């Protein structure tokens, strides 16, 4: 599932999370603010021509037939999504006071994974009904899902930085989950009262367990944007001796400068869904948004925000066309539960890594070390670049203290350095 904040800058398929093959739409999304209307208008039909020049064919977008706003990369993805869960979760024909809409507003305010849990519940209902329906079939599917590591959400979730898991935190978390579960139950019950009754037989307990399962097992999805390579190839194909081609290149340069400014102003935790010490410190994608967004949300001095945006504009003005063409475009960021990865154990020196090649959320595991028959495949649950203390702190959330060979070696190194400083 694509993170809700990421939808502000990337148009991705609601089912497979691949980029929508429409240059005009991708530009409309990233330049969605009214201030960019003149920029898009000045481009005219260039985005469509760039689309065709890349061999993509005319831009086309497949939308939900019921008008909810969901978009897809193909009719096949749209139809499959509708059959799996969207038939029960589409808000297109609903009134503003419908519990499903209220649930989605609640989820957008508090946690994206509430939306993913709703997809799981709708999927279970559809599977149960396809298998004949009834409470027993539903309960069997529930047990099948809980074969993965799980716990109530209040135990599995990570509190914000500086916040302790105290009575106030537990009360807030339980209230959030209970309200979401009540709204979702009210939304789904008219469609399948027997199956929904089984899902909520213990109140919000199963809903909370599913959310906890996501906390322990979900991995971050990242699908690279095709926009950068598309425009780079187009720029290389233009002849600088041709006046029309030169004019097109100048318009492309103006677009790229605005994109770089947007990346510096609106790219960060909100649009990636990666918070706190999960952020890769070596990431090439700018993180200036975090400070500016926090300043705006907290009502801090508007001059601070204005100055930061002006600084970003000045930085972009110094970039050459070659640098602009090499610049990063927003990736699709999301979260997902993958059964194969959810069954893998942790190692701080893993022998496989997870990647998402191509334009979709299809997962591939690739070996990073030599693997012999009988070896266990392990991934790293946390950032491999983090130091041993940070890794261990994060791994405590999974319920264990790591004592692998790498951790022990780094412990010894840290101890020797500390002893040397004391001498």
Give the ranges of each region predicted by the language model.
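Short alpha-helical interaction motifs and adjacent low-complexity tails used for partner binding
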Residues: 1-423
